[in-house]
Amino acid sequence: MNTQQLRCFVCVAEYLNFTKAANELYLTVPTVTHHVQSLEEELGTKLFERTSRMVRLTESGKAFYVDAAEILTRMELSFKHVQKAEESRVTFFRICLLYTSPSPRDM
C-alpha cells in the first residue's frame, strides 16, 4: 500500500466518480483505476461497487475510507510541521576578519 493508492481511493470515494477523481489528481482514469484495483487486491476486498453508470462504496470501502482519509490528513499535517520547523531554523555563520597593519613598504 502506498500514498498514491490511498489518495486515489479517497478521491474516488469523495467524488464517487473515477473521471472526476482523475481530473482532481491530474492523473488519467486508467491510472486511478489501476491504483484502486491494486489496493483492493492488496486488501483482499472490493472497496467500490461499480456499474456502468455509478460508483458506490461497499461496507468495507466505507470503513476503510475513514482511516485512509485520516492517514492522508495526518501525513499532510506532518509535512507542514516539518516545513514550519525548517523555516524557523536559524542558521548562523561567522565572518572573521583578520586585521593586518600595512607593511612599511606599502606606506
Identify what each model region corresponds to.
Residues 9, 39-40:
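Conserved amphipathic alpha-helical core elements
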Residues 10-27:
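Short helix-boundary/capping micro-motifs
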Residues 40-59, 80:
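A short LG(V/I)-centered, amphipathic sequence patch enriched
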Residues 42-43, 64-86:
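Alpha-helical linker/hinge and terminal dimerization helices associated
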Residues 91-98:
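Short, well-ordered beta-strand elements
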Residues 99-107:
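Single conserved hydrophobic/aromatic residue that forms the stacking wall/gate
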